[in-house]
């Protein structure tokens, strides 16, 4: 068999560097159009350089506005300048969503090979071990809490209170990262007072700034002329429309470049960017559906099946009855109507369904549900192993409640 990779070697004609610069995890040494925010962070943290206590910092801004990259960039420079005096911990609060898991993660970063378990040990022992290790090394601890609002939504102010107590018992500060502009107002007074953070705002990138960022990322990586200027401009325009999202603009360009490499195309055009956007959005949709809990998938499938026979609109009562039929076919116990209502609210928040409340006269008020992309979503749901024997349940319709929904 011929080597299947030979046909891709011609990409060397226009790829002269490492495409990791277009990876979402790549943190460049320079961040165009974030010089002001980086300088403000450096100024706030500068007291660490002469033995002082730095202010806590909160970074606000939309997704893709450079908050995380800037925080990591600044703390890398701090580590380079301060050396072993500073212990820096990056915590993604989507993954480590409690003070217990955060403390375990931090202790394990000091221990090395003999890691302590994520569960089972009393919290006061973990706390003691962490304080002891920080003090024995005479370290200044800087904790980056990415998506810090996740801690608040799950645990109230308690987790942040414990983290701030740790930094008070040792020496340290936090850099909190959030896209929730009202985050500080949701904290209780004891935590807000202890936090006393400086706020730094990351305004959305505009199209010109995104164009600069894209050109910076491909400079020295892609040969001139391989990507049409109009393609870069389109990526920047799409990112600007999405609240100045640099991450999306970079991802679109990466998908388009990789597609053109695979297809041995001569250059990246605006058509390739449109194709990349379609793939990008479908990937997000697929991932959103795949990661849903099983009962959320069954509710969504019920809405789709009901919608297929009901003029593209499903009534909540119909959805619940058909959901119970799906549960019976799959062999699971149905949840209560109240719990299903909560699941539908979550699906609405994710943009997978659109909910409208409509008066039904003497029948009262009901919610009408429309699934946004029913064909694609149905296919993604049925890829789940739990649905491998699903044959299609009998569809219930509440004809008394059905009126004219053509305007929805």
UniProtKB/Swiss-Prot annotation:
Superkingdom of the organism of origin: Archaea
Family annotation (NCBIfam families): orc1/cdc6 family replication initiation protein (TIGR02928), PRK00411.1-3 (NF001625)
Gene field: cdc6
InterPro entries per record: AAA+_ATPase (IPR003593), AAA_22 (IPR049945), Cdc6_C (IPR015163), Cdc6_lid (IPR055237), ORC1/CDC6 (IPR050311), Orc1/Cdc6_arc (IPR014277), P-loop_NTPase (IPR027417), WH-like_DNA-bd_sf (IPR036388)
GO biological process, one term: DNA replication
UniProt: ATP binding residues: 65-69, 205, 217
Keywords attached to this entry: ATP-binding, DNA replication, Nucleotide-binding
Stated name of the protein: ORC1-type DNA replication protein
MF terms (GO), sorted A to Z: ATP binding; ATP hydrolysis activity
Source organism (scientific name): Picrophilus torridus (strain ATCC 700027 / DSM 9790 / JCM 10055 / NBRC 100828 / KAW 2/3)
UniProt record similarity statement: Belongs to the CDC6/cdc18 family.
Pfam families linked to this entry: AAA_22, Cdc6_C, Cdc6_lid
Gene3D superfamilies: 1.10.8.60, P-loop containing nucleotide triphosphate hydrolases, Winged helix-like DNA-binding domain superfamily/Winged helix DNA-binding domain
